[in-house]
A protein has these predicted regions:
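Primarily the internal scaffold of c-type cytochrome electron-transfer domains
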Residues: 1-303
Length: 303
């Protein structure tokens, strides 16, 4: 275990809550502070400061994206060395940054110059289907996730940036991923996917023992796909195991990350048997040789 100390990673109050001068001035009055607390308890936030928890999913996620996004550039580039990012919490991400999903590199003329300077940028940072493959860019993964696109999921659905006094975990345990209490478990997904609550429903879905790693939603739908900060990091593109995707992109799938002695052919047959997933065409090596061995001997370091 490595323990480090830093004073600040440019992640102080303003980074998440915006400039606080007006907030401080307004709340010097203790009567106002009392009134604001009563209003907050009733669901009305203090208008003098930004609280990401009270923003919609896009604006809330944009606060995190300031640090956790792969960007194509920022609109205030000439002023950046002196003043930093122009982005302030509560703004749209696109107000300050050039969005950089894989499709943006392929369609946005504003990114052509950057791509011309570094033609490897797509291969180095994305899997060929658009999934982000570098650490610390979880916002890009979130953008590709149906739970975000079609639902109300945001970063704060699982993460909690301030440790609660009632949190039974130690400070290092909380700081590892900064997940809210209970969000290290299937409780995170059961916030929405309630049909899988209960041991019987879970086992019927996973086809694995309830207490096993394979019945942990994260391990199948958010497998570890990047490495950074001295650890493996989970994909934030919530997806399902797919042999077809592994064959098309070279990206390891959740099943073969656990079953290191099994081939893609074995996984394809299991997914077909359990979920009716079509078995994709594959060559003899992919059908018969352990996927972990194939990925070790060929492909690239991202595997």
């Amino acid at each position: 275990i490595m323990t480090t100390r830093v004073p600040e990673f440019w992640i102080a109050v303003v980074a998440c809550h915006g400039p606080g001068e007006a907030h401080v001035a307004a709340n010097r009055n203790p009567l106002r502070r009392y009134a604001v607390r009563r209003q907050a308890a009733a669901g009305t936030p203090d208008p003098t400061i930004v609280n990401p928890a009270h923003l919609g999913k896009e604006l809330s996620a944009a606060v995190c994206a300031r640090c956790h996004a792969l960007i194509g550039g920022f609109h205030d580039a000439p002023d950046y060395p002196l003043h930093g990012y122009a982005f302030r919490p509560g703004q749209k991400f696109e107000d300050a940054f050039v969005r950089a999903r894989l499709v943006d590199w392929q369609t946005n003329p504003a990114l052509e110059a950057e791509l011309a300077k570094n033609p490897q940028i797509i291969r180095d940072r994305y899997w060929s289907d658009g999934m982000i493959r570098v650490a610390g860019r979880e916002y890009n993964g979130l953008l590709e996730t149906k739970c975000f696109q079609n639902g109300e999921m945001s970063c704060l659905s699982c993460h909690k940036m301030h440790e609660s006094d009632a949190d039974p975990r130690s400070r290092p345990e909380w700081a590892d991923d900064q997940l809210a209490p209970g969000m290290q478990t299937n409780t995170a997904c059961l916030q929405c996917h309630k049909t899988f609550a209960g041991d019987a429903a879970l086992a019927a879905h996973t086809h694995h023992p309830v207490a096993s790693a394979a019945s942990n939603c994260y391990n199948c739908h958010m497998p570890h796909t990047t490495f950074g900060l001295l650890k493996a990091i989970r994909s934030h593109t919530i997806d399902k195991p797919s042999v077809a995707a592994s064959l098309a992109t070279g990206r390891p799938n959740a099943c073969n990350q656990c079953h290191l002695d099994k081939s893609l052919g074995w996984t394809a047959l299991a997914l077909n048997r359990w979920y009716g997933t079509p078995v994709p065409p594959m060559n003899a090596d992919e059908r018969d040789i352990a996927a972990s061995v194939l990925w070790t001997l060929k492909g690239d370091a991202g595997q």
